[in-house]
Amino acid sequence: MDSASASGAQRQDEGLRERMRPSPPVDIDAVDQALATAGYGVTTDNRTSDDKKTFGRTPDGTIFTVPQTHDMVSQLLSPTEPKNVSDLLVLAILAVHILIFWALSPQSRIPVFAAIYMFWRTSYNGGIGWLLHNQSHHNTMVRWATKSKIFVNPSTGKNPRPILYRLLKKDMETMIPKDYSFDEAPLEYNTWLVFRRFVDVILMCDFTSYCLFAIACGSRPENETTLMTALRWAAGWVLVIFNLWVKLDAHRVVKDFAWYWGDFFFLIDQELTFDGVFEMAPHPMYSVGYAGYYGISLMAASYKVLFISIIAHAAQFAFLVLVENPHIDRVYNPPPPRKRSVQHDLKDLNGFNAQTSPISDSFAATPAPNGIDDKASMQQPPSSVHNLLGLHNLDLHRVTDSSVILIQLLVFALTVLTPSTPFYQYLFVANAAIWRCWYSIGIGYILHRQSKYKSWTRHFVKYGENTDEAWRQWKGSYHLSMTMCYASFVAATWKMYSMPSDWNHGLALLKHTLGFSLAALQIWTSVSIYDSLGEFGWFFGDFFFDAQSKLTYSGIYRFLNNPERVLGLAGLWGAALITSKGAIIFLALISHILTLAFIQLVERPHMQKLYGRSLRKDAGLVKNLKRSLPPPLQQLGGSVDRIMDESFEFVEELLDSARPKLATGVNTFMKDAKSLFRQYPARITISRLDDEVAAGYNLEDYSLEIEGTESSPSAQVERSSGKEGANARAPPERRGDLKSLIFEYGAPIRVKWTAPLNHSKKDWVGLYMVTDNTRREVTRISSQGRWIATNEGAYDSLTCEKGLVTSDIVISASRRRDGENRDLASGEMVFSGDKLFWTQGVFEFRYHHNGKHNVMAISRPFEIRIGRFDEEDVVDMDNTTANSDGLIQAAIEEALLPVVRNCFDRNPEIAPETYDEHFGSLVDRDGKYAKRVVFAVHQMFGVELAPEVVRADGNVRNMAWRICNAKKVLAPYSMSRSRGTTTPTTQEKELS
C-alpha cells in the first residue's frame, strides 16, 4: 500500500485530548482591556504581571484566566499539597476497599472484587460517558448547576443550599490557592471543577479495585522455573513502567484541562498540538496507555486478570468511539467552507450533449477553464460513487461483487465438504501459496509495468476504451485477487487447525487469545489504511492517474510510514500461532517476505518517482524514539534505522491490538440497535389522566395553529387520480373556509400555541403521525426527538429548545376569539430538520402537559406530499430535439433546488442558493442529507439514486443532468404514456 495518503483533501487527525501547547507570554492587562472594549465579559482575579497565563473562553464569550491545577495523584497523595474534604473522602473510600480485601477470605476476594471493579469500570465508561455525552450535546451539567443555583452566593437569597455552597467554596479554593476565586469564576469552570472531583473518585477506585483483584488472582503456575518467573515479572514491570511513562508524558502535553475533558465545558485559546507520546501512537492514553494492565496480568499469571483487562480496554475504546471522537469532530474539525459556484464550459451551457456529463468537471479541486482539452480532463481521477470495499457497498448487480461472492461460496463449500486428510491439506496449502504469489508477484508486475509504461491503460485505449474503463477493470481484478488470496489462506488454516483437547493444558488458551488479537489488529490496520487512503489510494490510483495530489500523512500514517509492512500481516502470524503448524508458518513467512519485496520493488520506486523529496524519512514513532537515543546512536542509518523502524512499529502496535475488533463491533452494534429502536420505538403507557389536568386546567384555553409552505400544485392535483367513481372525480364541496393543509417535504413548520397563564413550564409540543395514536386524550408513542419545550430552561437539554421562538406572550381576554374573559399565554416554535418526519404522510401536533403525555390540544391534521414532476408541462412530448432536453433539464433544476434546500435544513453552510453552488462538506460527513434527497428524487422523478451519487454530484445542476439522462435511459421501460410513434392513447385521441 502507498506509504502515505495521496489525496488533495486532507482530513484533520482523528482527534484526541492531546492538543494543548503552552501559550506564549501575553500582556494580561492589555488583553483584558481589549476584550472589554470589544464587549466581552471579562472576569477579574488577582495576578502578577510576571505570570504566564492561560485564557479560557466560555460558550457565551466570557474570557477568564484558567488557574493552574495539579494532577489527581499529586493532589491526593503528595504531603506537600493541601488537603480538603473531598480529598479525605476519596482516601477514605480507597481505604474501605483495602479493608474489604483484608476482611474477605481468599476464596471470596476474586468474585467480590471482580464485581467491584466492573462496577467502577461501568461507572467510568458508562457513567462518565453518559454525563459527557449529554454535556457535549445539551450542556446538561451546566444546566443542572444553573437550575440548582449551588454556585450562587447565599447573600443574594437565591441559593437554597447555603451549606453546600460554603463546602464547595472552601474545597475548591483550598485545592486551587492561586489565581482562583469561587465567586468570580465562570459557572462553566466551577461546574468542571465539581465534575473532576467526581471523576477522581471513580478513577482512583477503578484502579485500586483492579489492583486488588489482580492480587487476589495472583499465583505461580505449576512447574514454572525460577528463570521463567523472573522473566515474567521483569516483562510485567517493563510494561507497567512504560504505562506510567505514557500517562506522565500525556499529562505533560495535555495538562489537567484535557485530562479531565475540560473542552466539554469551555475552551482554551490555544492550538491543537501533537507532541511526545502523541506522535508515537494513535490515542496513546487509551491504546498503549493500557499496557500496564497486561503487565499486571502477566505478573499475576491469571487468565481471569487478562480477560477482565481486555474487557476494560474494550470498554475504554467504546468510550473513545462513542463519546470523545464525536465531540472532537464537532468542536475541532468543523466542516470547511464550501465553494459557492462552479465554472462551466461555454459549450456545456450552449448545448446539452447527452454523451458528456458535467460531473467530471466538478471533481477537480479547481474548475477547468473554458476550452480545456478533453485529454487533460482524462488525467483527473474519476469521482468515486460506487465503491467496492465494505459490506455496505456490496452490489450483486455488479459483476465484480457477484463473482467474488460466488467464488467465496465455492471455496467455503470445498473447505467444509472435503476431509482434512494430508492430501487435501497439502492441496489447500499449495492453493494458498499460489494465490499469495499471484497477489504479490503478479499484481506487482502489472503495477510495475503500469508505472513505467502505462501498459494496463494502453491495452484498453487500444480497443477504444478510456482511462476510466481501465481503472474500473483494474479495481475489479485487484479486488478479486485480494479476496482470493486471503480466502485461500483462511481455508488452508481451517484445514490445518485442530481443536485443543484440553484448553487448560499448556499455552492453548493464551495462543488463541493472542492469535485472535493479532487478527483483529490486522483488520483494524486495514480499516485505518483505507480510511486514510480512500478508494483511490487503496487501489493504487496514482499508478493510473497523474493527478496533482498533495502528499499528506494523516490517520495511521501520522505514526507509521508503511503500516502494512508488519501490522498489515499480523493476522497471518496470529493464524500461525493458533495452529502451531509448520505449513501455516511457511505461508505466513512467504507472505511477509513477498509483501516486503512488493513494497521495496514496486511501491517505493513509484512513490519516489512521483513525490521525490516530499517523501518523509521517519514516521512519528521512529522520530520520537531517535530523540530519546544518545547522539552517537542517532547518527546510525541505513539498515539499523530500518530494523528499528520495523521492530518498534511491531511492539507499539501490538500493544494496541484490543482496539480494532471493538471499533468494528461497536459500530455494528450501534447500527443494529438504532435499527431496532426505529422498528420498535419505546412506548409509554398511561392508565389515567393526571389529577391536576382534570382539576385545574380548562382545555378550551389550549390551542395549536400551524403554518407551513404549501406543496406544489401538482401535489394537490394528484389527489384526484382518475381511478375514482364518477361522483368522486369532481372537486370536493367545502362548507367552511378551511382547506386541506398540504405542506412541502422538509419545509419548516411554524406552530403557534396558547395555554392558561398558569400552565406548567414543562409543557411540550410533539409531532406525530395521525395513525400512530388511537386516543385523543393520551399519547402512547414516543416522539423520538420530534418535540420542543414551550419554555426555556425547563429541561436539562438544549435539543428540546431548538426551534423555540417565543414563550409566554400574554394575550388579553379582549383579543380572544371565543368570547372568554380569561387572559392566555402564547408562544411560537418552528419544527425543522431532525424534528420533522422525512417521509410522506398525514401528521399532527400534540400539546402535552407538565412533561407527561396527557394531551391538552391537537392541531389540524396536515399532509406532507411530494408532487411528481411532469415533463408534459414543460415541452411537447413529440419534440425530441436537443432544445427539448435543455428545457427539461432547466425545469428539473428549478423543481429540484427548493427540495434540496429543504433536505439540507435550509442551512446556509450546506444548502445551495443557485443551481451551480456546491453542497457544503457536511453533506459528505452526515449521510442523512443525501438520503433525504434520494427519497425526494425518487418520489418526484421516479428515478432511484444511491446516496453516494448525491455527494459525488455536488450541486443541483449535476443532479439535474443525471436525472434527465436517467429518465431518457429508462423511458423505453416506463409504464407511463410513450413518447414514441406507437398507437395514440385515449387521451391523445381526445386532444387531437
Curated annotation (Swiss-Prot):
Belongs to the class VI-like SAM-binding methyltransferase superfamily. CHO2 family. It comes from the Eukaryota. It is a multi-pass membrane protein. Residues 1-10, 709-719 have a biased composition (Polar residues). One of its GO terms (biological process) is phosphatidylcholine biosynthetic process. The keyword Cell wall biogenesis/degradation does not apply. Residues 1-84, 133-197, 247-279, 324-403, 448-477, 546-581 are lumenal. InterPro entries: Phopholipid_MeTrfase, Phosphatid-EA_MeTrfase_fun. It is found in: Endoplasmic reticulum membrane. Pathway: Phospholipid metabolism; phosphatidylcholine biosynthesis. Its main location: endoplasmic reticulum. It comes from Talaromyces marneffei (strain ATCC 18224 / CBS 334.59 / QM 7333). The gene is cho2. It catalyses: a 1,2-diacyl-sn-glycero-3-phosphoethanolamine + S-adenosyl-L-methionine = a 1,2-diacyl-sn-glycero-3-phospho-N-methylethanolamine + S-adenosyl-L-homocysteine + H(+). This is Phosphatidylethanolamine N-methyltransferase. PROSITE patterns: SAM_CHO2. Residues 11-21 have a biased composition (Basic and acidic residues).
